[in-house]
């Protein structure tokens, strides 16, 4: 059967929308199609003979496992990798397979938007379920705590030896400490007064509070968009959200020194809770700390999840809950030297 004059292989590869690269056994790039040049923001001349892993300031895939798998003649696939290119984070799928004894074919494809949305919905449902479970447990703990404290007070009054009240006082103090923890688990019960004003009032107040806590080796920068429209929000709640996140950022940089950035921007065509918004407000909290460990990133907003030994894991869970009450969302990206939390709030 006649096949006609087929186009050159490179023309076929350049017509693909996904990034395709050919590397050798040492991971040195031998070829990159047009889509790869665009994603990597490099020319073919610069890419040629460059190690593949050197293209990224950070990558989440296991390069050693990938090299070992390919050396055994097997294909390697990671459906969700984070690649940081020119300080921009990209979530992609990575597949690699040997095409000869000397060469390996790599394909990079951006995560499908529908798949990303589905994952976000699953994670949100899991977080809501975990939050409701914790709230239920908190209520069950709170009820007997009141009885325990009251009994300790009555016992203190009836003790014949005043010296023994030292022990009942310990019971009362520990009951109060547990009640405070339970109240934090339940989150704020009174949202305060809702206002329609610039979000910069809240952001600036948080900046002032955090600046008082910053040691000399930490720089706090502010980058506000003056054209950001006013929006309806509960200032006390948004202040709590920003304080929780910014204090985490401060703890990430205060020992070694670094920078925290508070930034506001207008974002366009963003989906919040299943509704497409033409215009939303975005508040970013960025720090130059060591980053969030990969094993914590999928469950970071769950109650009681913390990357610090002395952390209680409630700050981000409460922040997520408060942003949800505003019909908004929180996203983050993190790698060593850069962690960015973005809060999206609808402008109506």
UniProtKB/Swiss-Prot annotation:
Keywords recorded for this protein, A-Z: ATP-binding, Cytoplasm, Hydrolase, Kinase, Nitrogen fixation, Nucleotide-binding, Phosphoprotein, Transferase, Two-component regulatory system
Subcellular location: Cytoplasm
GO molecular function: ATP binding; hydrolase activity; phosphorelay sensor kinase activity
GO biological process entries: nitrogen fixation; regulation of DNA-templated transcription
The PAS domain, residue ranges: 5-78
Residues the record lists as binding ATP: 329
Cellular component GO terms, alphabetical: cytoplasm
PTM annotation: Autophosphorylated.
Residue ranges of domain Histidine kinase in the record: 136-348
PROSITE patterns: HIS_KIN (PS50109)
Sites bearing Phosphohistidine, chain numbering: 139
A Pfam short name: HisKA
Superkingdom, natural source: Bacteria
EC number: 2.7.13.3, 3.1.3.-
The protein, known as: Sensory histidine kinase/phosphatase NtrB
Source organism of this protein record: Proteus hauseri
Gene: ntrB
